Amino acid sequence: MFMIEELEKIALQRCTTAREAIRLIGQLVAEYGYGDSGECLTIADPNEVWHFEVFGEGPDKIGGVWAAVRIPDDHVGVSANISRISTLDLKDKDRYMASENVFSVAKKMGFWDGKEPFKFWKAYSGGNYFGEPKAFSIREYFILNALAPSLKLSYDSEELPISVKPDKPVAVTDVMALLRQTYEGTEWDMTKNLKVAVKNKETKETDTITSPAANPWMGTDMLNMLNGVKEGTVTRNRLVAVPQCSYSHVIQLRNWLPDAVGGVAWLSFDNPGQSPRIPIFSGTTDLPAAFGICGQHRHREDAIVWKYRTANKLATVRWGLTKEKINGAVAHFEEKGLSETVSYTHLTLPTT
């Protein structure tokens, strides 16, 4: 049986388009089985982006169930580790793909009665990781609503569109900013009740501010202590930028450029709310040795992740005082990367 990482590796090795990758994964799952938990993947090439989801076929079956939806060219799709695919119009081959057993397994397992309209997420997932019977969580809602406020999406809905057309064009910097989101200044801000009184040195008056020690990445012990002192002090919300993240990336696929420079992965390690991103071109064949060393499960000075992690953990201690410095450094490195990327791309384009 395949795990999701193995399927990803084989698809990347053997396929040149997103559609080819989806078909190959489907064939491998049908023949050899899928033994991992439910997963969703974004599978993209320079011309298309697809949202792909896969589940096992059952405890006594070697196989799997999967479905895929193409994100329209002018849309943005979001899935944060939950099933998002709803109805499947398999007659529309330009937009939808699915395993042959997608409906039969749902009926056999009692997930769908065959009478009500079939919804993939409802049959194979039933809800999000908070136990809510929804095809989204706060993360999907926040991003989709931020990009298309004109749609007036409701958090009380059972499901949201798998993708939306943004109210204005989305740049790579916009995606980076969304991946840094902690809901600061919104109703979901986990630090909004963590206030302290401070005396203004100039006016001698007392102001109430968010505590410098407050941060959106507080652990369970801290949250339990604060809520133990006063119930309801902090409502835990799943952030877009989570501190347990090992790495994240924003990938640009530009079909008007040669492959070697048309693809760029903007990579960062550790907490995406604090870490700057660096550009890695698809034509890159080598990186500094520290990038090839795994420091995920233990401290290693020679692993790049620990350079990020150390700075982030220290900054978090008094985030209210260090936030501006960290954000300024992130902006500096990302702006430097963006300007140098544009220059490098122009330098490497063939001349006529």
What are these regions (language model features)?
Residues 217-341:
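Substrate-recognition/cap regions that form aromatic- and gly/pro-loop-enriched pockets
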Residues 345-352:
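Conserved small/polar residues in nucleotide/adenosyl-binding loops
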Residues 40-44, 51, 247-251:
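Short beta-strand scaffold segments in enzyme catalytic cores
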Residues 2-33, 135-211, 215-216:
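Alpha/propeptide regions of enzymes that mature by internal proteolysis
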Residues 37, 46-181, 186:
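Extended, regular secondary-structure scaffolds
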Residues 52-54, 211-215, 219-223:
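Soluble extracytoplasmic regions of secretory-pathway and membrane proteins
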Residues 32-40:
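Internal, well-folded beta-alpha domain core
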